Amino acid sequence: MNPDEPEADETTPEEEEWQLYATAGYAAAEDPWDDLVEIEDDEEEEEEWFDGDDFETNGQTLDWDSPPCPAPLGIAHMIRLGTCNHCLHRVGGRRTEEIGEKGGASLRAEAFARDKELEAFEAPDLCPLCENLFEDVDNIVERIVEQTGELDHGSLQVGVHVPKDLIQEEDRIRTRHAAPGSRPLKAAFSKAVQTGVSTRMDGVEFVKERPDLMILIDCLTLRVDVDIRPVFIYGRYRKLDRGIPQTRWPCRACRGRAEGCEACEGSGLQYPDSVQDLIGEPFRLVLSAEDTSFHGMGREDIDVRCLGRGRPFVLEVKRPKVRRTDLEEVMEAVNSNASGKIEISDLRWTNRSEVSRIKETRAEKSYTIRFSVEEPPEESFIVESISNLSGVTLEQQTPKRVSHRRADRNRKRKVVSIDNVVVEDNEVQFSVRCEAGTYVKELVHSDEGR
């Protein structure tokens, strides 16, 4: 052995220094991963679809894994849940001679015949699918008949509001246990009400669009509201007298409040007559309605007459108890009562869609204008100057007379044609056809160059 080498049990200074570090927790003396604990994988528990806590089962066991209807076990399970006869029929998925409550009763009887113990099962009193809502169908039908008995109608539409939590609960149970294609609660309840109304009222048609009456049912409070839909009448009017606005003009002093003021003598109107009321009031009385709205194809100024064939309009009669009448008779009454102020013609029944057409149509308008000139120039100059405007596109700034209610901007409007220019002493008359929206008065006097 080499005398210079250290003995086996002897340690060199370098080794002693290393051991000090090792015992202090460095190097391989301590494994930093020794404190890790192996975690066993837990099996994922399948989420329970429904735990049945909302149902009173009187200590009896319900089989939540039963097959859906129309299987006999599925129908038996729905009976154990406390399903009412009406809901049992709509989710059972089986044909029966009767429908509704009687159909469900026959399915229940068949289930009892198959399983004698099922009849002794103490099911909850409250149906989990409708919360016994179908028990109130007769009550609701009675209210509908009472509220619509004096109203003229041929078609109804039923709208039902069901609490959201009941809709969700019913949908959850029906999706799991009902027969495929079963009718949802809201649709089934609406159908039951319609069936009940049909048995009480002859000749009633249930529609999804444009009903005469809209029946609104709140299933939480069992409140029934009847919305009487308006009727619409198309026609044309000729305004023969000046000083009549097209629609009601509220009083400037009291702003049209119901009791009015001294300025309007309690009427709430700036002008006692309007085209709207001269036409609408006879219709309101004949149809026993609450009010009217007037929709004209454009409008003329209050001091302007409307002649020729007349201006198209649609009269909306709101909440009428009577929905049909002889239009010719009413037209004669309107023309007679107006005492030469207006005349109407071409009346016919229409619908709301024509209101949009009337409002959106930008029809050209024709005027016959007559004005005077203090110091008229030569007749040839007048005729030439006016005739040269035919076909010209005007750039009109908002007139001063309407600047308080219209945006101040420039509008381009075309003069389609000008003809029949006549000069008589200091008066000039001509006919003009121009684009919708043209300020005709300002075309004549220029509104100080605006």
Protein language model features and the residues they cover:
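Non-catalytic RNA-recognition surface used by pseudouridine synthases
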Residues: 2-435, 439-450
